[in-house]
Amino acid sequence: MLINCKVGDKFIYHAGKLLSKHGYFHAEDLKLKCHVVEILDDAIILESNCSKKNRYYMTEETKELYEKEEN
């Protein structure tokens, strides 16, 4: 298990950190709110709070881009 969480937990995805690594420095502070929709053996699937079409996959390689929101 990547981190201790359950379906419905809220996270902030620091997408700007990933984008800035690829040269998009203007997006460095981009943060997206999302919530856990499914937990797999090797990944956690999160869905955007704004758009049900956007899904993000937290893996061992990307888990530092996510910050758990405290309720």
Model-derived regions, located:
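Mixed-charge, Lys/Arg-rich low-complexity intrinsically disordered regions
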Residues: 1-7, 14-19
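Intrinsically disordered, low-complexity segments enriched in small/polar residues
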Residues: 9-12, 22, 54-55, 64
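Surface-exposed loop/turn positions
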Residues: 6-9, 43
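Short linear sequence elements within intrinsically disordered, low-complexity coil regions
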Residues: 16-18, 29-30, 61-62, 71
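Intrinsically disordered, low-complexity, charged/polar segments
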Residues: 47-71
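A detector of low-complexity, intrinsically disordered, Ser/Thr/Gly/Pro/Ala-rich segments
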Residues: 1, 10, 37, 57-60
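Basic/aromatic-rich interaction segments and small domains that mediate binding to polyanionic partners
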Residues: 20-56
